[in-house]
Amino acid sequence: MKTHELKASPRTTRGNGPARALRREGFIPAVLYGPDSEPITLSVSHKDLSDILQGVGSSQVMFNLNIEGADAPRKAMIKELQTNVVSQRYLHADFYEISMDRKLHVMVPVVVEGKSKGMEEGGLLQVIRRELEVICLPGDIPEEFVIDVTELGIGEAVHLSDVPKGDAVEFPESADFTVVTVVAPTAAALPEEGEEGEEGEEGGEGGEAEGAEAASEE
């Protein structure tokens, strides 16, 4: 996982008024915290953060936070990113300070490749899990899990135990649940309770939080 440089400035003011003023100037309020340090209130450039996160999830990026006046960068990941529901502009960022020798719980996206045999026969591909939780050191976090479904027929599935991963990565889940499956058209019309189908995705200071469980230490 690539590490990105991000400038940050200490912030002494709090509250909705100062936060709105920051946003008008092109910045967003942020906070950095971790298990071994006191929280630090910060501001970061909306443009710089947006450029880094372009095309990737907020939980898939590591940062070197270059805080003005600090002796050294602070390595962190986004724990929570609040977004305006209408404009989709960032409102507030929570950065979680990490240690490269301490394992994290992180969500990693699932990417499906190929057109399955079952789809050629009229079946429907259902992606049940679009993210998988892993435990590993920050330097071993996978960018994504790529699953080739070319040989998958109707009624067949890829389970958690089938997902390729390196020895440095653990799945905390004990159940061998279904990640991807191909179902007959009639079955596809009646998804099981609690499952999210291929199109079943849903999208705070007045916003929605992304990556709320992006990184937590074991």
Swiss-Prot record:
CDD domains: Ribosomal_L25_TL5_CTC
Subunit note: Part of the 50S ribosomal subunit; part of the 5S rRNA/L5/L18/L25 subcomplex. Contacts the 5S rRNA. Binds to the 5S rRNA independently of L5 and L18.
Signal peptide boundaries: none
Entry annotated with the keyword Aminoacyl-tRNA synthetase: no
Name of the featured protein: Large ribosomal subunit protein bL25
Function in brief: This is one of the proteins that binds to the 5S RNA in the ribosome where it forms part of the central protuberance.
GO molecular function: 5S rRNA binding; structural constituent of ribosome
Keyword annotations: Ribonucleoprotein, Ribosomal protein, RNA-binding, rRNA-binding
GO biological process, one term: translation
Family membership noted in the UniProt record: Belongs to the bacterial ribosomal protein bL25 family. CTC subfamily.
Region (Disordered): 1-20, 185-218
Acidic residues bias: start-end ranges: 192-218
Pfam families per the UniProt record, alphabetical: Ribosomal_L25p, Ribosomal_TL5_C
InterPro entries: Rbsml_bL25/Gln-tRNA_synth_N, Ribosomal_bL25/Gln-tRNA_synth, Ribosomal_bL25_b-dom, Ribosomal_bL25_C, Ribosomal_bL25_long, Ribosomal_L25_dom, Ribosomal_uL5_bac-type
Membrane spanning residue stretches: none
